[in-house]
Amino acid sequence: MAKTSWTPGQQKVIDTRDCNLLVSAAAGSGKTAVLVERIINRITSENSPINIDQLLIVTFTKAAAGEMRERIGAAIEKKVLEQPDNVHLQKQLTLLYSAQITTIDSFCLSVIRNHFHTIDLDPSFRIAEEAELMLLKSDVLATLLEEKYEEGAEDFLEFVECYSASKSDEPIENFILKLYQFSQSYPYPHEWLEEREKDFLVETAEDINQTSWMKQLLQYVKAILREASDLCAKAIEITNYPDGPKPYLDALLSDQEIIERLLNSDAGSQHSYEEYQDAFSNITFARLSTKKWPDATEERKEEVKAIRQMVKKILSDLSDDFFFQPMEDMLTDMRKVRRPMLVLLSLTHDFLERLDASKEENNLVDFSDIEHFALNILVTKEDGNLVPTKVATEMSEQFVEIMIDEYQDSNYVQEYILSSISKVTRGCPNVFMVGDVKQSIYKFRMARPELFMEKYEQYSTEEGLYRRIDLSKNFRSRAEVLDSINGVFEKIMTKAMGGIEYTKEVSLYPGAQFPEIGMDLDNTSFLFSDTKTELIILDLKEEEASIPDSMDRLDVMALEEDAIELSKRELEAKAVAMRIKQLVHGERGFSVTKRNGEEQDLKRCQYRDIVILLRTMSGWSETFTEILKQEGIPAYSDTQTGYFQTLEVKTVLNYLRILDNPRQDAPLTAILYSPIVGLSAEQLSFLRVKPGKGAEKLSIYDAARECALNYLEIQDEVTQPEETQPVYDSIIQADLMYEKSSAEKTVSMDKNLIETGEKLKRFFATYDKLREKAIYLPVHEIILEFFKETGYDLFVYAMPGGEQRRNNLNLLVQHALSFEESSYHGLFQFIRYIERLLKFEIDYGEAGGLSENDNAVRIMSIHKSKGLEFPVVILAGMGKQFNTMDAREKIVLHADYGIGPECIDYQLRTKCPTLLKQVIKKNIVLDNLGEELRVLYVALTRAKEKLIMIGSANDANDVFDKWRQDSTPGVTPLRFQTLAMAKDYFSFVGPAALYDSRIRVITLTPNDLLEDEYEKQTDIKNKQEELNPYNFLQSFEEESDEQSDEERSDEERSDGEQSDGEQSDGEQPRKDLLTKLSFRYPYEHEAMLPIKTTVSELKKLSQQVDEELTETFTQVKDELTKTWPQVDEELTEKYPQVEELIETSPPVKEESQMLIEPTIPKFLKEEKELRGTERGNLYHKILELIDFSDNKTKLNLREFVSQLANRGLIQEESISSINFERLSRFFESELYQRIQIAYQKGYLYREQPFVIGIPVREISTQKFVRTTQAQASSILSKNEDFSHANLCSCPNSQDYENDDLVLIQGIIDVYFEEEDGIVLVDYKTDAVGELGEEELIRRYQEQIRYYERALNQLLDKTVKEKIIYSFSLGKEIRIKS
């Protein structure tokens, strides 16, 4: 392998020693590889090698730490192979697993474990789970506020009156929790809170002007005024153009004078708010001259007017937002809010102390505690300064160098911890820091990118004790991708917006080599196969959006209007699906680079090469996953949302809720309506409207209990026997009287009460048993008992997506186990725990279905994609507005500027914003926009070869107009005010991309999406409802009811006919008596149902039963007819399928016709002969592994089979059993040509396993019905006491209950997709008799039917053809539906 070639910048990073080194490493610059090489260089240095455990290597995540340790280990092993006698290197391998390659949390934890005694900490502490900690905080807060209410202090009640919600203290709780979170990012939380108290102790204008927030405001105002001045100068310049409106010049000069006066007067001093306020309140704009100017064009006039309007709006907004009141009014407001804000800060102090006490009581710590405990061990205060402790000094001697990865995500506490164990304070800087401030996206975790920027600006690029090295060469992406990213960010990323100026020094430069892809010069085509970055706008306006001449139009086939209504997200997902199909399956689909060592080539883009990035997953990933699957695109979404919203988890949680407290109408109703009980909507309403005094006032629980009790009472009356009579007098008469009495009472029952009561009786029997156990069982065992008693886990496993649903339930059991390890216990606390998770939107994400190794499109959040790379990146949701909720609260909070409240007079019921709130609000918005800008940078830099950005807009014309207004060709960067007003990613990218030839801007309309060349003309929604298992069950109930009605009608007609004399008087009583005497348990066949079976078993049993029925049915029927002549007609009517089977079965050969073969012992048989099943498996294995991309000859096939044998995939001795003539005939067939086309398009699927749930009622003439009938016939035909009633009462398909589901599993040989549906193919190697095709069809049509059912149910697509390919016959056999 060739030696790695490092760039000059990378080599500097590797070699630089004895200084604090900050490495600004751009995306894809190979920082991890460089860091590993630096470490290896340090431990293998010829001059002064060190041990690996003398380095402290701090990474951001455990995964990164694991990867780093693995890379270092591999590099050391490589060195050992080069120098096998090097004892030092061998020692490093031993030390590697004890070396400090760790996250900051793990390092702090090790500090605490080793030095807990220095801070008087119990070493047996446990790290609290997030949800457990959340419950603890909730309990502490609730107790604190309850005590404050009991005390009834006036200032507390005033605070609550002003800032709480009308029916809840939730806003106050949120304020306290957020202040607590901010305080934890500082070394000493209580001190930070005390600093915030000082913000409200201002008394004079001097006090106000000295605050940090006022200084920041004045700097911001000056920056905006300079931008207004530039705009004004631009307008003046236009008036001097030959076609400019010169009469406007006077007004513009007046505007310029106003702005310059604001900038250059005493208002620029530190005591300037009053002067600014006075100046803004006295601004008067001159009117534009109406004088005609013959050379002036309307376009220039409108341009000047637009610019002037922007200037006036800038000044007006500054005045309205910040200079809306004199200083005295401001001071008055600050005095008014002082008392309630001091109450809030006091509550936060109390909460912090009580929470610490509660955690100490439960011996718990959280990650914030771990950092602060480590800080207390390593740092102490002396004369107001932070200095290292003795422990820190000792530890600093242990480490030769401290290496910090992802330094841009550090906070102040971490900075103090790592600085304390460095040698910086002793004049020997030894800290290595690597990161990229442009990728700092963890503001919500209180990351402080300012730490990085302070050093970035202070450290020199020259040699010295504090040095900076920039790595800007990108080894990840194509030049086209990098050029477009640079083109965007050089216009939108500035020091004020994003934290760093996007200059040439920080731009991305291509460092990787890629094979060339042919450019698509036909820009009118809707299939772009080049690497040009795309910005797609989905125009949701009804009429067509106009498109600038400089843009390309995505020209898809014009189609008629479709009435389907889809949401914005669904339409956007459809647009993404269409683009993915074009990339993967289009005539000129996209190609990606395939690397094999140092060699690289192009390959067709696959689904696994594509990732869809989303800013937020909640609500978006579900929609995209669903739409992509509907479009036939496999999609994998590794989301941390959606778990608690899955049907199966919601159902189990609702059951747990009613186990804890049944008098909760909502969860109880959900359970009654679920398949666990199965009440219909009509039956639920019956519980509320059934006759009875006060029924409508009962709770659902009481009404259900009453209904079940009423049903039991009536049932007792029906089944209670009459007064005993001598059975010897007339047993037949007694039976008839009993039957008549029962029938009359049953008919008198209320139908609703019977049906509802029966279901409720079963429900309460299970519920009462579980509720008793819930008192003493742990939660996870309660859930398992619930599964055992109800079988609900098996039910959901039989539903579509059953594997994932069952995984979700198993995950719930695991969460219950984890909960039991916390400080909370019992069912009630577990439900509280879940409710809190739901309230704070903490979700676990569904258990995995597809995995990241499957050929599927990935859907993930931008945050989760950080550090990853993908050949094709689609950034969706470009038009989704940014979240600004934290800037719209009554009290806004900022880590640097503290608390910004509204001034509320609860007596006068008035409120107004304080200046402090306005300043903090503006800073929150700007900070959030800077964060969004960096998130966007992370998203775009994930792309290796193709970058696509897509979003929707209500009106593309308006969007384009806004972009034109905000952008000026050649001007870099965009105006700060433009960036500060951004509402979404379109607002950032659009103006930057508008005039950039490196980005293709495309518009789509909904009509372009509803029917493209891949659109399937199906009503997806209706198909989903049809395939819903609950709807299946409901349809079976209705079918059963209809059949029962028909049977009753037939019986009534039959009775009527018999009364006319067609049946003898004595025959019916005899028949009834014999039926009663031969009574069999009515649910015997249900008791025999297996939970799971296979398609092969069903087919095999079907064949066995066919033979058995054919042989016995006629004999039994003949025997019965001797005694009861009418039995022939009854059996034929009840089992027409058996009669049909007898008629269509092949004739049984006479004994003389049968070929008698001598029996040969197995050990004398030739080993090369394979049994039919083994030969079939061999053919299947070959067809599973063979490449279908080209035609095959017998020679090709022999070579391929030999390769399989050499690789151990098949037995070499089995090759002689292959008929290559028959095998090659398959590759010459028309079917293979279709398979080959599907394979090339990626639409061929081989050896696909499945598991589906099918109601046993649908498994007609198969295992459960026919086996029982065959067994009954066989047994009873040999029994002298045989009664024909037994045979006639054998179970038929309609005898099974609606909810009897059987799991059926199988493996489909092959299926492929064509434009109008799925083609199902089954390979058969069976020898075929005289009947040929008919024999194969009869033998396998039921098996194929189950395969078809599986594909319909699991893929939600139609099977248009079912084909058996017989290798014996060498032809395709089509099975009709």
From Swiss-Prot:
Known EC number: 3.1.-.-, 5.6.2.4
Coiled coil regions, renumbered to chain: none
Listed GO CC annotations: cytosol; DNA helicase complex
A Pfam family annotated for this UniProt entry: UvrD_C
Enzymatic reactions: Couples ATP hydrolysis with the unwinding of duplex DNA by translocating in the 3'-5' direction; ATP + H2O = ADP + phosphate + H(+)
Biased composition (Acidic residues): 1036-1065
GO biological process: double-strand break repair via homologous recombination
Domain UvrD-like helicase ATP-binding: 4-478
Keywords: ATP-binding, DNA damage, DNA repair, DNA-binding, Exonuclease, Helicase, Hydrolase, Isomerase, Nuclease, Nucleotide-binding
Residues that hold ATP according to the record: A25, A26, A27, G28, S29, G30, K31, T32
Sequence ranges assigned to domain UvrD-like helicase C-terminal in this UniProt record: 526-867
Cofactors that this protein relies on: Mg(2+)
Function in brief: The heterodimer acts as both an ATP-dependent DNA helicase and an ATP-dependent, dual-direction single-stranded exonuclease. Recognizes the chi site generating a DNA molecule suitable for the initiation of homologous recombination. The AddA nuclease domain is required for chi fragment generation; this subunit has the helicase and 3' -> 5' nuclease activities.
Family to which this protein belongs: Belongs to the helicase family. AddA subfamily.
Assembly behavior: Heterodimer of AddA and AddB/RexB.
NCBIfam families according to UniProt: addA_Gpos
Protein known as: ATP-dependent helicase/nuclease subunit A
Organism: Lachnoclostridium phytofermentans (strain ATCC 700394 / DSM 18823 / ISDg) (Clostridium phytofermentans)
